[in-house]
């Protein structure tokens, strides 16, 4: 009977540790979800700003005529 009580106590202790671990992991998932939402919003804003950028009137270096050599 004592052995059965010890086994039950061990199981209760494991359950308590598992509950603590699950709560800790849940908090981490919540933080990561908030971070992901923030990053998605920043990406959306950057994409919007990038689509509004006008093309430059300056020719690329490959299109420029080389300077005269003396």
Curated annotation (Swiss-Prot):
* Xref: Gene3D superfamilies: 1.20.5.300
Q: Which SUPFAM superfamilies match?
A: Tropomyosin
Superkingdom = Bacteria
PANTHER family registered for this protein in UniProt = PROTEIN SLYX (PTHR36508:SF1)
* UniProt family annotation: Belongs to the SlyX family.
Q: Which HAMAP family match?
A: SlyX
Stated name of the protein: Protein SlyX homolog
Q: Which organism is it from?
A: Shewanella loihica (strain ATCC BAA-1088 / PV-4)
Q: Which gene encodes it?
A: slyX
């Amino acid at each position: 009977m004592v052995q059965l009580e010890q086994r039950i106590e061990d199981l209760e202790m494991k359950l308590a540790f598992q509950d603590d671990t699950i709560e800790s992991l849940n908090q981490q998932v919540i933080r990561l979800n908030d971070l992901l939402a923030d990053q998605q919003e920043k990406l959306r804003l950057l994409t919007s700003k990038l689509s509004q950028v006008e093309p430059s009137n300056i020719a690329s270096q490959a299109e420029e005529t080389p300077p005269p050599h003396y």
